[in-house]
Each structure stands twice: as C-alpha cells, then as structure tokens.
C-alpha cells in the first residue's frame, strides 16, 4: 500500500443540516474541495455548498465501494467522505482500512454514534 500525503476525512453524520456539524467539521468542509457522498443523499449534502462557501466544491456521488475506492485513490489533495453514523462501527470504515494506510485516514463519527 503506497502512502500518500493527502488525508481522507471520513465524517459520520446524523443530520442533513450543515449547522448540525461541530464547528471544527464545518471548517474542514469549507476548506476541502473534493467531497465524496453516497448517492442516496448526494443532493442533500451538495446543497451545503450553497452556504456562501469561498471554495468551489467538487462532489463525487459514490454508487459502489469499488468506484469510491478508485476515486479516492485518484485524489491528490485532501478529501472528505460523508457517511452515516459511525463509519468504523458499520459501513465504509473497514473497506477504507483495507485499501488505505491508517495515516491517510481520519474518522469523525457522528455525535449520536457515541451514545
């Protein structure tokens, strides 16, 4: 596995409202250009970019894990991957850990995932 300098920030959400993200993650979203979102809630998350953000966003609607992994591997700069709840408990976390080094990944489970 070749390690890259860019980070993949995996953000678990429990709401489609941008304002429900902690301020740290709102800032991360503002600063990151490339965003991957599951196809099932792509339009809701894409609407976050209408919040007077300075940086234009490039969104990727992931329809399959294979397609998503290929897209993530092609990215040269930091990316955000939106998931539901806690991505390490169930979902995409395991697949990411099989394809990327731990140093490339940062996980931010949703607040309700701690309950």
Feature map (PLM): residue ranges:
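Class I S-adenosyl-L-methionine
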Residues: 1-115
């Amino acid at each position: 596995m070749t390690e890259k300098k860019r980070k993949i920030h995996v953000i678990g959400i429990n709401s489609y409202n941008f304002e429900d993200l902690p301020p740290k993650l709102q800032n991360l979203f503002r600063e990151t250009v490339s965003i991957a979102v599951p196809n099932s809630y792509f339009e809701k998350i894409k609407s976050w970019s209408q919040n007077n953000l300075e940086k234009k966003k490039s969104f990727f609607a992931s329809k399959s894990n294979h397609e998503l992994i290929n897209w993530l591997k092609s990215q040269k700069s930091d990316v955000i991957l939106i998931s539901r709840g806690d991505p390490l408990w169930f979902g995409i976390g395991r697949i990411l850990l099989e394809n990327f080094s731990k140093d490339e990944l940062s996980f931010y489970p949703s607040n309700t995932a701690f309950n």
